[in-house]
């Protein structure tokens, strides 16, 4: 019999219940008020008193209202039909809901029960299978989706029967399994999984090493991220976090893209809803939305649903990773999620940590980032979740707890800087403060040596050193004046500016410059390094400035030209002639 409870106190969206039976941590309950049923999650149990966070507005909720517990945690429903869907944090299909505003207590089924899917069996009767083993395959938007043994299945099962190739709905039984005790299990295309529990149906989780191409030079060349890697993008308002995220999600070499708009302003979420269906996937020429799932929770929705939205997104990503797919998960922004945690922690009168965030913020963030990664599945195939979260620190302060704690766990750090954004140097990633720890991995070094060449990482470290040196000289020139430093210093400074303008800066709105393939990035890097190694002859600082401005202009025109086209080669020849003109004899 289901446990029941009665409301004994309400503080905003935290409700205290007195219960008449056993209740588990993170269990879901429904509180009845005025004909609506409000979904809530247990966050603390003290004897017969239970604290729950409500995922809806608690306006009008009174002491004495009835609550009924479901006996399960917050779960997502997984199966074919999720691609190109827009969900909220509780996996309600937003397209099925009526009206401009979401109504309280209204829940929709996330999948389409009526659609038929063409099923192709991969297993046969008599096969031994375990949890997450592939039984068959359906195609959705040209993506091969696997139908798997239920994730919670224990031990080894035998396939008793499996349907032949044909069209079936998600609720049709496609296979019958027999477990070790002889019990029959009917399997359809639907899976359920609690969002707070990580899926561990894989053989091993090695260190990731394969470069994830994004087409963004400041990432791929200078601070690369790998398939199954983690990164985060902190930056104050107006520095281009969202544009950079859009560029990565559009261009990255991933099979599935999941966007969790968690606590963003409503206008930004609407922008995602209207822009993404229009974006063309550069890899397939089809609409990017066909392989994208958007999970939206705006800042004016109840805070508890923000927390649910990031976990829902990660669980859906783990589902696709179990199929051997490469998933890219973008969360915008994890700061709003941390603020939701802070709000609940404060309402429960827990001991506050720095800036009143919960004391266990560090472990919550690290556990969440730890769910991403590159895995080898039980059948030897590989899958990955690459997770990139944005952080919106208050006032652009990168020393606040969310940024500091994320820095400990994310291996890539792309610091967006107000100063670079003000100078219109986009993407406004600070090349000196940003880093990628994957460059230090021997596995990654070996991969890059085979994929590109053995000198690549040495060259990348050289341009970072030159950028640092250029910054130091710029400060000296500011203090001492142009005449106060030697001409050689001006040359070093302008060589660092060449690296900045040609490699780091990129036009996200130009068709050619927006996406730079690795082959082209290699040529740009080699070209810039060769120029930096060349000694030039100058008499005064004005000559240095005029000469390098001409050079930067030609290189910029090359970036806007199609790779290896006549126009590109023409500019390349002009550049070579210009270099010869001033070469020190």
Each predicted region: which residue ranges?
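Short histidine-centered loop motifs in beta-beta connectors
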Residues: 54, 59, 119-128, 159-167
């Amino acid at each position: 019999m289901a446990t029941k409870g009665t409301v004994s106190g309400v503080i905003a969206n935290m409700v205290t219940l007195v219960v008449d039976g056993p209740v588990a941590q993170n269990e879901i309950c429904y509180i009845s008020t005025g004909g609506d049923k409000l979904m809530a999650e247990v966050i603390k149990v003290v004897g017969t008193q239970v604290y729950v966070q409500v995922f809806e507005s608690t306006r009008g909720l009174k002491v004495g209202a009835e609550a009924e517990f479901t006996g399960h945690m917050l779960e997502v429903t997984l199966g074919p039909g999720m691609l190109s869907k827009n969900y909220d944090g509780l996996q309600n299909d937003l397209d099925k809901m009526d009206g401009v505003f979401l109504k309280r207590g209204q829940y929709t089924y996330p999948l389409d029960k009526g659609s038929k899917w063409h099923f192709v069996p991969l297993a046969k009767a008599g096969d031994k299978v375990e949890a997450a083993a592939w039984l068959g395959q359906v195609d959705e938007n040209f993506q091969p989706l696997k139908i798997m043994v239920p994730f919670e299945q224990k031990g080894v099962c035998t396939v008793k029967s499996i349907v032949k190739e044909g069209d079936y709905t998600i609720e049709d039984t496609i296979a019958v399994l027999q477990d070790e005790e002889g019990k029959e299990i009917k399997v359809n295309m639907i899976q359920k999984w609690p969002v707070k529990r990580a899926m561990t149906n894989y053989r091993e989780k090695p260190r990731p090493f394969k470069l994830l191409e994004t087409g963004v030079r400041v990432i791929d060349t200078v601070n690369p991220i790998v398939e199954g890697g983690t990164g985060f993008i902190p930056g104050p308002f107006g520095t281009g976090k969202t544009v950079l995220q859009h560029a990565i999600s559009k261009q990255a070499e991933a099979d599935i893209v999941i966007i969790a708009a968690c606590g963003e302003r409503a206008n930004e979420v609407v922008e995602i809803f209207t822009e993404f269906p229009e974006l063309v996937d550069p890899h397939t020429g089809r609409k990017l939305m066909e392989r994208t799932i958007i999970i939206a929770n705006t800042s004016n929705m109840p805070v508890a649903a923000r927390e649910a939205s990031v976990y829902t997104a990660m669980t859906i990503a783990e589902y696709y990773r179990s199929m051997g797919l490469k998933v890219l998960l973008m969360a915008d922004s994890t700061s709003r999620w941390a603020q939701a945690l802070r709000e609940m922690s404060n309402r429960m009168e827990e001991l506050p940590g720095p800036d009143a965030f919960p004391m266990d913020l560090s472990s919550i963030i690290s556990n969440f980032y730890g769910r991403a990664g590159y895995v080898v599945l039980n059948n030897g195939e590989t899958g990955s979740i690459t997770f990139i979260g944005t952080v919106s620190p208050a006032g652009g302060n990168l020393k606040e707890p969310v940024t500091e704690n994320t820095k400990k766990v994310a291996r890539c750090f792309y610091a967006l800087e107000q100063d670079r954004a003000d100078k219109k140097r986009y993407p406004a990633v600070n090349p000196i403060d940003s880093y990628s720890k994957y460059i230090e991995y021997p596995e990654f070094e070996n991969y890059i040596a085979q994929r590109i060449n053995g000198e690549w990482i040495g060259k990348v470290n050289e341009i970072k050193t030159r950028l640092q040196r250029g910054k130091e000289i710029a400060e000296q020139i500011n203090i001492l004046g142009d005449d106060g430093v030697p001409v050689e210093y001006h040359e070093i400074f302008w060589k660092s500016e060449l690296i900045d303008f040609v490699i780091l800066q990129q036009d996200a709105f130009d068709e050619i410059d927006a996406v730079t393939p690795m082959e082209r990035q290699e040529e740009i890097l080699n070209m810039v390094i060769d120029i930096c190694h060349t000694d030039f002859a100058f008499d005064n600082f004005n000559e240095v400035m005029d000469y390098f401005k001409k050079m930067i202009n030609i290189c910029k025109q090359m970036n806007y030209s199609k790779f290896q086209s006549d126009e590109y080669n023409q500019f390349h020849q002009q550049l070579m002639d210009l270099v010869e003109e001033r070469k020190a004899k």
